[in-house]
Design a protein with these regions (language model features):
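N-terminal cationic-hydrophobic initiation segments that often serve targeting/anchoring roles
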Residues: 121, 213-215, 248-251
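Conserved SGNH/GDSL esterase-like catalytic core that processes O-acyl groups on lipids
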Residues: 102-203, 231-240, 265-268, 272
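Extended, compositionally biased non-globular segments
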Residues: 197-202, 208-221
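Short, conserved loop/helix-junction motifs that constitute active-site signature segments
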Residues: 77, 171, 215-217
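Structural recognition of the beta-strand scaffold that forms the well-ordered cores
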Residues: 81-85, 90, 128-132, 174-179, ...
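N-terminal secretory targeting modules
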Residues: 1-85, 90-109
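Extracellular serine-dependent O-acyl
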Residues: 220-228, 235-275
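Generic structural signal for well-ordered alpha-helices
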Residues: 206-211, 240-244
């Protein structure tokens, strides 16, 4: 996703179509005024803007908001909070394409609001946040720490130049979804790194990450999700079992669970498959 395009979903008055509201923002190197919504009928309206493409596509910052009317107090936020950590599956890669469409690296195919985690959060009426990086792993098997989620989550933003650190006490989720391990397995199959005891290393590093999350969020339930990505060389049954064993290694009071999905038709799931 190096084309530098940024897409957002602009929802007006509670609209729920995150496919139709997918909007490209013009790329700018300096602040520029952008019109998000116009020609609304006179009266009170609620406008929500969600970033749909991940940080490696492009970052954007809101400096101020203006209106030709006036701002009222925002609606109350949902009580239930769900947070997700993941790779391209959580970032929404490929979700903007239809079944049968060829998958590309264009950011225009990515919509994080159409992933299963985002859809489930809306079904449950929950506030949703995601920390997702395409190509990300849960384990570090060589000297490179690039795209290793446990070494990135303390950043406010995944980009290497992000200087702000994230305050985990500022927003405590009730449920944490973790969908990682796919790129670990794919990378190992493609010999992108060497590991003599890969399965055991993967299991140990995944468990270590969950232990860290339980330290940060001791009262949160954690759900390990797996099996979504369709890759011919991946033994889904074997690795779904491995991820289940990670969850089962925690005592019942820790509230760590595992859920395996059916693989997509090809590669990353489309928006109809995630729904």
């Amino acid at each position: 996703f190096m084309d530098g395009d940024c897409y957002v979903c602009i929802q007006v008055d509670g609209a729920t179509d995150y496919y139709a509201s997918y909007t490209r923002l013009p790329k700018q190197s300096s602040p520029k005024e952008v019109s998000l919504v116009k020609d609304l009928e006179e009266g009170a309206h609620t406008v929500s803007v969600y970033k749909a493409t991940e940080d490696m596509c492009v970052s954007f910052e809101v400096y101020s908001l203006s209106t030709d009317g006036f701002f009222t107090d925002p609606p109350e936020k949902p009580e239930l909070k769900i947070e997700a950590y993941g790779d391209s599956l959580t970032a929404g890669r490929g979700t903007m394409r239809e079944n049968g469409d060829k998958e590309t690296d264009a950011s225009s195919q990515e919509n994080a609001l159409l992933t299963y985690a985002a859809c489930a959060s809306r079904e449950l009426g929950a506030e949703y946040r995601a920390f997702a990086v395409s190509g990300a792993r849960v384990g570090k098997y060589d000297q490179s720490a690039a795209n290793v989620i446990p070494q990135m989550i303390s950043k406010y933003s995944p980009t290497a130049n992000a200087k702000k650190t994230w305050n985990f006490s500022s927003w405590r989720p009730d449920v944490v979804i973790v969908d990682l391990g796919t790129n670990d397995v794919v990378g190992h199959k493609r010999n992108l790194f060497t590991s003599e005891n890969f399965d055991e290393e993967l299991k140990a590093q995944y468990k270590s990450f969950i232990e860290r999350l339980k330290t940060l969020y001791p009262d949160s339930a954690i759900v390990l999700c797996c099996g979504t990505f369709s890759y011919s060389q991946m033994d889904h049954e074997k690795y779904n079992r491995l991820f289940a064993e990670v969850a089962e290694s925690f005592s019942a009071e820790k509230k760590v669970y595992c859920h395996a999905f059916s693989p997509s038709t090809k590669g990353h799931p489309t928006h109809t498959e995630t729904a």
